[in-house]
Design a protein with these regions (language model features):
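Bacterial Sec-dependent N-terminal signal peptides
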Residues: 1-26
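Short, hydrophobic/aromatic-rich segments at coil-to-beta transitions
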Residues: 25-30, 96-103, 125-129
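K/E-rich alpha-helical interaction surfaces of small helical-bundle regulatory domains
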Residues: 26-40, 141-147
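Central antiparallel beta-sheet cores of small beta-barrel/beta-sandwich binding domains
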Residues: 35, 40-106, 113-114
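A cross-taxa feature marking solvent-exposed loop/turn segments within ectodomains of secreted
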Residues: 38-40, 111-113, 123, 136-138
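Well-ordered beta-strand positions
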Residues: 48, 93, 119-122, 144
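Acidic, glycine-rich flexible loop segments
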Residues: 103-125, 130
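Short, exposed beta-strand-loop hairpins at the edges of beta-sheets
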Residues: 129-139
């Protein structure tokens, strides 16, 4: 009987820890971007926290023939700079609904900055919804979490 109680305690502990890990998913980490028009993989983006705000940068380019791409359409300090290492999100704040919002979501292909929102998919916490706004128009991409081995 004693072994049965001990086994039950271990099962409860394992279930509790599993639930904690599952529920504690955050937006922070590495994400694979998928072109929502073509369906092709484009890059790995690292989302990180700096000074209490969310930021993101390109850490790997996956798209064929674009590994050393420069931001040729960009202006100012980004003009002709490598896309690899470029910050694409700056100063996003989390609201009370778990959505990160900011005014600096940069698309190096279009060389444009948008207002943006990011949130974890309710159905799959390994998917991140990234939405860029230009006035009342918007476009949403789904990024996939890079699972570390």
């Amino acid at each position: 009987m004693k072994n049965s109680k001990t086994s039950n305690k271990w099962m409860y502990l394992i279930c509790f820890l599993f639930c904690q890990i599952t529920w504690s998913q955050t937006v922070f980490g590495k994400w694979k971007t998928i072109d929502d028009r073509k369906g092709s993989t484009k890059a790995i983006i690292e989302i990180y926290k700096e000074d209490g705000l969310m930021h993101a940068k390109v850490v790997e380019i996956l798209e064929e023939g674009k590994k050393g791409a420069l931001c040729t359409k960009c202006e100012g300090e980004r003009k002709n700079k490598p896309i690899l290492g470029m910050k694409i999100m700056e100063d996003f704040e989390k609201n009370n609904k778990g959505i990160y919002k900011g005014d600096k979501l940069f698309d190096p292909e279009q060389a444009m900055t948008f207002k943006g929102r990011d949130w974890l998919d309710d159905d799959n916490k390994n998917r991140l919804k990234v939405r860029g706004y230009l006035a009342f128009l918007y476009r949403t991409q789904t990024w996939h979490r890079v699972l570390e081995n």
